[in-house]
């Protein structure tokens, strides 16, 4: 039996740039840090840190998360392990939670090295929502706010804004897509 190549943009294309260029994400991280906006960080293995960005080192692709803005109790978060960066609104009720860095940064899955720019850009231009299937099983839905080679911005139904890293995505479809 012949093996056919999948030509479906919802499964992404091979990334042109590797390792990833996090410069666009770095700008967002700095904004969140300077404005003391609470965040939810989700790792590639579904571990969650809810707190603040206390410090950011763009040269090392490293976020230091804390339970307080500019706090001293810091957990190292490697951008290479980050699946989702969600901005929490001031109206959100949330519990601060920190997990050990070695558990958060543990790479349970191999990075996909896939680029989902085409499907995200198409949904953005058509004004339709997207549905994101994460490698660890979570399914996210929302409206795309922009896309680049390594992540997509998504506004969720509760109004929160998140950045979803392509390396931990298995598929992206439009929200109106039905199999």
From Swiss-Prot:
Superkingdom as given in the UniProt entry: Bacteria
GO molecular function terms listed in the Swiss-Prot or TrEMBL record: DNA binding; DNA-binding transcription factor activity
Keywords from the UniProt entry: DNA-binding, Repressor, Transcription, Transcription regulation
N-terminal signal peptide: none
Membrane-spanning ranges: none
Protein purpose: Transcriptional repressor of the FliC phase-1 flagellin.
Protein name: Repressor of phase 1 flagellin gene
Gene transcribed to yield this protein: fljA
């Amino acid at each position: 039996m012949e093996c056919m190549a999948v030509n479906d943009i919802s499964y992404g294309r091979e990334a042109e740039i590797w390792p990833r260029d996090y410069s666009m994400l770095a700008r967002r991280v700095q904004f969140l840090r300077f404005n003391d906006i609470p965040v939810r960080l989700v790792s590639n293995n579904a571990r969650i840190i809810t707190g603040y960005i206390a410090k950011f080192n763009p040269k090392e692709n490293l976020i230091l998360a804390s339970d307080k803005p500019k706090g001293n109790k810091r957990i190292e978060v490697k951008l290479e392990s980050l699946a989702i960066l969600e901005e929490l609104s001031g109206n959100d009720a949330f519990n601060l939670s920190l997990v050990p860095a070695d558990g958060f940064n543990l790479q349970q899955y191999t990075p996909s090295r896939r680029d989902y720019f085409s499907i995200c850009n198409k949904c953005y231009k058509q004004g339709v929502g997207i549905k994101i299937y994460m490698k660890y099983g979570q399914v996210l839905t929302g409206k795309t706010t922009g896309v680049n080679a390594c992540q997509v911005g998504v506004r969720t139904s509760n109004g929160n804004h998140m950045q979803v890293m392509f390396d931990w995505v298995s598929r992206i479809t439009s929200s109106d897509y039905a199999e």
